[in-house]
Amino acid sequence: ISIEAIKQSDGSYMAFTDNGRNQTGSEVIAWAKKVEDLGAGEILLTSVDKEGTGEGIDYNLISQVCKSVNIPVIAHGGIGKPEDVEKVATDLPVSGVAISSILHYQAIKFSDKNANFDDEGNIEFLKNKRSISLINTSRISDIKKLLKENRIQIR
């Protein structure tokens, strides 16, 4: 199951849908436990606040969910460089790390500022290229090499 989490002003995390657009009214930890009870076999946990920023994973969120459930958790949102993948895989009890920005932001860095992203959802982010400077683009082969060198299992 995929859980999209947004941190609230009180420090809690609420579950959202539709790329963080729609509130569910469910607190993330409670929802993670419920989906496990309902038979989910794995959770893809996205920090909407960190997604696409390159600022690093939300360790608090990922750690809380991993401690709350007995099913595998895949961390997603915030990876800015290959070393972030290594750090998450080493420091947190996750079953995997989902990445995207470090693989494709090179194209956005050099795209036309007047490009029309209206159907993409996060329009202001894409048009302003906010935080793209924190993304260190890489190739899958380089990321795999780094992980293998550090004896981190890859699929």
Task: Specify the residue positions occupied by each region the protein language model found.
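Conserved anion-binding
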Residues: I1-E51
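Catalytic cores of alpha/beta
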Residues: N60-I99
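Conserved, mostly hydrophobic/aromatic
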Residues: I1, V35, I43, V65, ...
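Short loop-to-alpha-helix "cap/lid" segments that border enzyme active sites
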Residues: N22-G39, G56-N70, I79
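Active-site-adjacent beta->alpha loops and helix N-cap segments on the catalytic face
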Residues: S2-G11, E51-C66, K81-E86, Q106-N114
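C-terminal helical cap(s) of enzyme catalytic domains, especially alpha/beta-barrels
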Residues: A89-R155
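Hydrophobic alpha-helical segments typical of transmembrane helices
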Residues: W31, L61, D84, R139-D142
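Short secondary-structure boundary segments
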Residues: I3-A5, S47, G77-G78, S100-I102
